[in-house]
Regions:
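Residues forming the flavin
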Residues: 1-199
């Protein structure tokens, strides 16, 4: 098409858009804030659920199609939208994801050893905190862990804690087990791994 498109973010939405655009003849550059591509597929979903090699294969396939990736590039800091247009981009697709935690506004949520799932999973999945001190990204490896929530992210966090040595891991959810929004398979796996559920 001869058109240049900037894709901001390399998570599921960003790489899907980049692939479709490349297949249709667009010149695509993906700007990613992290040092690797994949977004939540890499930093949020644990290796035991989605191997990083699968995501890398997808990114490599996009590069083979001509998609360019600019890592460690925070749009807004390294360039504004206006500056990207000045650099010759005809369009910008914003796929920045939802990486911010949802605060509960309850007493104690800012205490030491209280982590939001996205920070905890990012430390383990992307920054190799599970290999401390080999990698200098520590995270607590508690023997007793409580995860509040009933979605897939909560299941990922509690199952990761079990793999990091938690002897007693609990999922605490405000409604009934049947009302948990997680996939039934995720709940089944968590229970099979010894996670206790407190609805």
């Amino acid at each position: 098409s001869g058109k240049k498109v900037a894709v901001v973010g390399s998570g599921p939405s960003g790489i899907t858009c980049a692939g479709e655009l490349a297949r249709n003849g667009f010149d695509v550059t993906v700007f990613e804030a992290f040092f690797t591509g994949g977004g939540v597929l890499v930093y949020g979903i644990p290796e035991f659920r989605l191997p990083k090699a699968v995501v890398k294969r997808e990114i490599d396939g996009l590069e083979d199609m001509g998609v360019k990736f600019e890592y460690n590039s925070v749009v807004g800091n390294m360039a504004t939208a206006e500056e990207l247009f000045e650099q010759g981009f005809d369009a910008i697709y914003v796929a920045t994801g939802a990486g911010l935690p949802k605060f509960l506004n309850v007493p104690g949520e800012n205490l030491p050893n209280v982590f939001f799932a996205n920070e905890y999973l990012t430390r383990v999945n992307l920054m190799k905190a599970n290999k401390f001190p080999e990698y200098d990204t520590p995270t607590k490896h508690g023997k007793n862990v409580v995860v509040f929530g009933g979605g897939n992210v909560a299941m990922d966090a509690v199952r990761t804690a079990k793999r990091l040595g938690a002897e007693h891991a609990i999922i605490a959810y405000r409604r009934t087990e049947d009302e948990m929004p997680c996939r039934r398979a995720e709940l089944h796996h968590a229970k099979a791994e010894g996670v206790e559920v407190l609805p």
